[in-house]
Design a protein with these regions (language model features):
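Polar/acidic, low-complexity leader/linker segments enriched in S/T/G and N/D
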Residues: 1-75
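A structural signal for short, hydrophobic beta-strand segments that form beta-sheets
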Residues: 11-25, 30-32, 90-103, 148, ...
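Intrinsic-disorder/low-complexity loop/linker signature
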Residues: 32-34, 54-55, 90, 109, ...
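Short conserved beta-strand and strand-loop elements enriched in small hydrophobics
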Residues: 75-91, 140
Length: 159
């Protein structure tokens, strides 16, 4: 079987996000180049080991492998996000946040893929920041490639 593009959407109530840092700060990793981060938040981006709204199951071991494969991109600060659900790679003019960390977290007996986001001081980032401040639910969308087997389980997954 050939890998296919898999897109998962996950609507998250703002109360499930945790604020790590607030206020306009300069990113320490960018050698004082005045790149402004509006705030840093952590929150769930998808459910693990359970069927998603699209009828697929992402097992923990597959997600852990995908995170490991993405480590160099995360360290290079190259995992960009944007508002809405882009059809292609994020457009630099539409970037709202930078994903700096991905990990698995158990909440009330269920496992989730969590991410740490730096909300950027860009037009789209300011919109995302305002949505967060207003406690509006934030939808996340994961894009990856994998093979879906006959049991709806995703195999050989790449974020």
């Amino acid at each position: 079987m050939q890998k296919q593009l898999l897109i998962e959407s996950f609507l998250v109530n703002a109360r499930y996000f945790t604020e790590i840092k607030t206020g306009v700060t300069e990113s320490a990793n960018l050698q004082n180049k005045n790149v402004q981060i509006l705030r840093t938040i952590q929150g769930p981006m998808g459910i693990i080991n359970e069927e998603t709204a699209n009828g697929r199951i992402y097992e923990e071991k597959e997600i852990l492998n995908a995170i490991k494969a993405l480590e160099s991109k995360l360290k290079a600060r190259a995992c960009l996000g944007q508002l809405d659900h882009p059809k292609d790679e994020p457009s630099l003019t539409e970037v709202s946040h930078l994903v700096t960390e991905l990990f698995i977290k158990e909440v009330n007996g269920k496992k989730y893929l969590y991410g740490t986001w730096e909300i950027l001081n860009t037009p789209a980032g300011r919109i995302l920041n305002n949505l967060y401040e207003a406690k509006i639910a934030i939808g996340t969308s994961l894009r990856g490639y994998g093979i879906v087997d006959e049991n709806k389980k995703v195999k050989d997954y790449e974020l």
